[in-house]
């Protein structure tokens, strides 16, 4: 079933489910966070180390979903990239060779701040999470197994975009969040491109 995505004077249609990129839903994402809490609720090993794993995994998942960033870019983010005063993350985008400024909510900023306070890096030039892309894949797949949801990192990015579209967030805002250089890229991924949509795009109404 297609969902209408109103914006301006148009009614943009989300693609059919099987035509959309593989993605997770917000409920899936919440399920992953719950799985992190369950996994480390009763640690069998050193409690301090278990708490670090819990906090690291939770922060990875939150940054993946709430920024919509690519996993490699998220893993490269350093503590100095988080601007707590302006409540944004200045995320370096390797694919575009630019910086995407992403607004963050206060709750996520608090979690980042707590992580830095509890686990201060030996070198602030090192990434915040300081794990490899392979390790991040394993962490994410681990919670996919726990919840019974097949998942890979890029499904967070697509999932956020689709969630925002379904929440009637304007297309340019979503495109900026994803760091797309052109909103047509966003349209092609997720929406049915009809002749009317093309006309409105050319006319600058989208």
Regions found by a protein language model. Give the residues of each.
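Conserved catalytic core of the tyrosine transesterase superfamily
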Residues: 1-206
């Amino acid at each position: 079933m297609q969902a209408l995505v109103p914006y301006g004077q148009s009614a943009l249609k989300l693609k059919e489910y099987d035509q959309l990129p593989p993605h997770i839903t917000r409920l899936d994402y919440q399920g992953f966070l719950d799985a992190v809490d369950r996994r480390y609720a009763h640690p069998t090993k050193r409690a301090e180390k278990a708490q670090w794993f819990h906090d690291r995994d939770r922060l990875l998942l939150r940054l993946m979903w709430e920024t919509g960033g690519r996993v490699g870019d998220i893993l490269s983010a350093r503590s100095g990239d988080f601007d707590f005063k302006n409540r944004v993350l200045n995320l370096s985008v390797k694919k575009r060779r630019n910086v995407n400024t992403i607004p963050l909510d206060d709750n996520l900023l608090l979690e980042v701040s707590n992580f830095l306070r509890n686990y201060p890096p030996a070198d602030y030039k090192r990434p915040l999470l300081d794990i490899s892309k392979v390790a991040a894949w394993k962490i994410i797949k681990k919670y996919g197994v726990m919840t019974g949801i097949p998942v890979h990192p890029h499904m967070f990015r697509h999932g956020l975009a689709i969630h925002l579209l379904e929440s009637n967030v304007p297309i340019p805002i979503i495109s900026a969040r994803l760091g797309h250089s052109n909103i047509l890229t966003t349209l092609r991924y997720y929406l049915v491109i009809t002749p009317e949509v093309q006309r409105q795009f050319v006319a600058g109404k989208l």
